[in-house]
Amino acid sequence: MRPVGRRLRILVLSWNYPTGAAPQRGLWVQRMCDAAAQRADIIVLVPTPWVPPLFPLKAVARFRTIPQWERRGRTEIYFPRVPGSIEYFTHDFDARLALRNVLALARRLHAENSFDLIHAHFIYPDGVVASQIGQALNIPVMTSEHAFWTPWLNDRPRVGSQVDAALNGIKLVAPVSPFLHQNVAAYLRDRVEMTVLPNVVDDSVFFAAPRERDPNQLLYVGLIRRLKRVDVLIRALAEVRRTHPTMRLKIMSANAFRAYGQDRREVHDLVRTLGLESAIEIVAGSDPPAVAEAMRQCALVVVSSARETFCSVAAESLACGTPLVMTRCGGPEDFVTPADGVMVDVDNVHALAGGILEALGKRDDFDAADQQSRIVARFGREAWCDQAMAIYDRIATAYRCRN
């Protein structure tokens, strides 16, 4: 174990982290860092696209506004400029393009005050780069996994080969749910130790509080992309309104990636086609406190996804004491119970509409205090920090003993 009173020094590497240019991107990573910073020194490296002066495309030029360094609370954050890393245009090459600049910064920071552990988020490009930094600087590496490895790594063999080569330099892979653990384990085939380290629910923001709820308001929070099946939810709303004509839907969604622009246009077209303009409000780019307040004021939160690795929205909704109507989409099935809402099959408009009506019918039977206490006890900041620090201590201590 580390000496009594000495805080671990953790280097976090994540391409996904909130910035002024993309304030909703990587909120889950920021929450993990904020929670860990209660008991460890957290330094975050966020590889950031280098953009030349006077670049004409605003969607890319916005990255020039990101500072080189800043401190948020207890966390230090560096934004080293790297070639590429603009959405998915250079995806297959992003690890190789970024390594030189990120390694140089990590080497300098390590020389000033040595790190005990590198914690990367996503195996690629983050984990691949972290593996090479760890081997160069003799620091153990772990990754948190927030996305499915298959079919992704099989469909992109250039990425898959880089991941395979990096595994020897990674001590632990930590998917965010048992559901994702199964997917990643099938690819790893026992080549690296694994454990589950879930996402954090920020219980200082997402908590139950007395509010006058709107019994006719449904809430969806998340990206508008095909995997989220927002189209199924919109069609289900149209079906619900046949018997409940005052029912409305609020969609709170950040325009995080230009790649999903066509998906957003299709959703807007569907709303117009079904004549639901007055029943659906789409709000872009709300911050977490605004999302939490919307959760506290709505009747139900709806999760319509085909697949979810964890589903922070489901956990946050329950932390706010708001029941769910949710598809059987994997990750949240580990913590959502019949006492928390209604589960239905994926890609079934009629089933989703029926689930909404069923949950509305027993809305007063749900116990908000019980929902909140169960979620916070498992995923709140203190609970998460207990899990993370035990993992950090174990990896750092074992590595020191072997070296």
Question: What is the meaning of each model-derived region?
Answer:
Residues 306:
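Aromatic "clamp/platform" in nucleotide-sugar-dependent glycosyltransferases that forms part
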Residues 285, 338, 342-349, 358-364:
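Conserved acidic donor-binding segment of nucleotide-sugar-dependent glycosyltransferases
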Residues 1-70, 399-403:
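N-terminal subdomain of nucleotide-sugar transferases
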Residues 285, 293-298:
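Short alpha-helical donor nucleotide-sugar binding micro-motif in glycosyltransferases
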